[in-house]
Amino acid sequence: MDRRENDQSLSAGTIEGLKMTANGFYEEIVIAGFGGQGIMLAGKLLAQTAMNAGKEVTYMPSYGAEVRGGTANCMVVIAENEIACPVVGQPDSLIVMNKASLHKFGPRLKKGGLLIMNSSLIDETPEVDNSIEVIAVPADELAVELGNKKTANMVVLGAYLQKRGHLQIETAAQALPETIAERYHETLPVNIKALKRGAEFVSHFSCV
């Protein structure tokens, strides 16, 4: 399996809300926001985490005009067996960091899916099917509390991992050095804290 960092397709557990096929567990995820929010990093980390956990994975980032000032997004597919197509039309899970991303991808989310949104920048009730579970995470505020607003992407990813339960936070933390460029390794501790903070938030959210 080719695991080069710049490869646009990186291919490499009961899980709440995930679909089970004849070939086992299979989930399609879209992560979206605007350029500068670390959308691609979150997608790469999710893909690397799943790969390190022995899953099959594809990762497809969206580059080009959309990334600058508009909606940046990436598609991640995680499965127990070979993935036929890396393109995600209707995601099982959607992580959105801003309103534009919610408006663009919200209508595509499958019934019974999971929506995690950054309520720091999304102050509206999403117009999605009633079967979809919506979790609003004040990611920017939580990241600021940790001392680095740029870790909001890790907060929402931690929330997703905790909610779905198919991958462990510790596995994601261990995958960070492989995902973040070495010159930014001084940020590893705060990024790990952000992953855990997002997970803690969802744990509390589920209990209220």
What are these model-predicted stretches?
Residues 2-208:
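Active-site cofactor/cluster-binding pocket
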